[in-house]
């Protein structure tokens, strides 16, 4: 019998391996709502409040906390307990003067890192297109689209944003506040593969026509390794442009 419509439930045993979630306590857990992040790169807000931050003992308490609107993601109130909090999202609780950044730990699990209060967020450009009117649309890793107004998209001096670059998005205005280009010598955060969760500098980029580019990086211990470009998230030059 065919499945009609999107799935509404998720068994704990079928949840992504990088969720910090006890598997055999109960049968089901929260399925994140469709949104800015894929399921394997995000956590539903309920799990963030109950299982990661430990602000609640059960789902009922966590829902009540979320519904107060006191938890912000990227400067916006989120009252839906299924809303996904994903990579590089800035989660803040102004009433408690706490700010967290959603990252991966070195085991690849989704985690929260307590950070300084920030008014910007890092986003990776995953694609870009020219839209009606000749302007450039940047498609970012968290599902948002940013329009860059230009007089002529074919001019290199106006088309400064490239796929793989990172941009700083202001909070809560949600507009572009800065730009960090992809390239050799830049500091990157690894979002997948064996070296997930590590910071490393780009040493070399091998361009390939039919497959993802191969990037050679060097970590703080001087170890060199290779990974594919989709796993490389540019965060700065010598230091991250935000507190990480």
Curated annotation (Swiss-Prot):
GO terms for biological process: translation. Residues 43-106 form the S4 RNA-binding domain. InterPro entries: Rib_uL2_dom2 (IPR014722), Ribosomal_eS4 (IPR000876), Ribosomal_eS4_central_region (IPR013845), Ribosomal_eS4_central_sf (IPR038237), Ribosomal_eS4_KOW (IPR041982), Ribosomal_eS4_N (IPR013843), Ribosomal_eS4_N_CS (IPR018199), S4_RNA-bd_sf (IPR036986). The keyword Transmembrane does not apply. GO terms for molecular function: rRNA binding; structural constituent of ribosome. One of its GO terms (cellular component) is cytosolic small ribosomal subunit. It holds the Pfam family Ribosomal_S4e. It comes from the Archaea. Coiled coil: none annotated. Keywords: Ribonucleoprotein, Ribosomal protein, RNA-binding, rRNA-binding. Belongs to the eukaryotic ribosomal protein eS4 family. PANTHER family: 30S/40S RIBOSOMAL PROTEIN S4, SMALL RIBOSOMAL SUBUNIT PROTEIN ES4. NCBIfam families: PRK04313.1. HAMAP family: Ribosomal_eS4. This is Small ribosomal subunit protein eS4. It comes from Methanococcus maripaludis (strain DSM 14266 / JCM 13030 / NBRC 101832 / S2 / LL). The gene is rps4e.
């Amino acid at each position: 019998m065919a499945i009609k419509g999107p799935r509404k439930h998720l068994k704990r045993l079928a949840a992504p391996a990088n969720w910090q979630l006890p598997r055999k306590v109960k049968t089901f857990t929260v399925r994140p709502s469709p949104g800015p992040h894929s399921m394997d790169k995000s956590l539903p807000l309920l799990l963030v409040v109950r299982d990661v931050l430990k602000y609640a003992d059960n789902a009922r308490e966590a829902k009540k906390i979320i519904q107060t609107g006191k938890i912000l993601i990227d400067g916006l109130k989120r009252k839906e307990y299924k809303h996904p909090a994903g990579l590089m999202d800035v989660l803040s609780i102004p009433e408690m003067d706490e700010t967290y950044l959603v990252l991966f730990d070195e085991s690849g699990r989704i985690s929260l890192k307590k950070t300084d209060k920030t008014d910007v967020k890092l986003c990776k450009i995953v694609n870009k297109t020219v839209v009606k009117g000749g302007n450039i649309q940047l498609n970012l890793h968290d599902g948002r689209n940013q329009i860059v107004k230009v007089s002529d998209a074919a001019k290199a001096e106006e088309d400064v944003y490239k796929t793989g670059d990172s941009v700083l998005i202001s909070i809560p205005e949600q507009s572009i506040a800065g730009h960090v280009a992809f390239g050799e010598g830049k500091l990157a955060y690894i979002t997948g593969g064996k070296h997930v969760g590590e910071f490393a500098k780009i040493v070399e980029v091998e361009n390939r026509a039919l497959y993802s580019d191969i990037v050679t990086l060097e970590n703080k211990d001087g170890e060199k390794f290779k990974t594919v470009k989709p796993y490389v998230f540019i965060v700065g030059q010598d230091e991250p442009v935000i507190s990480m």
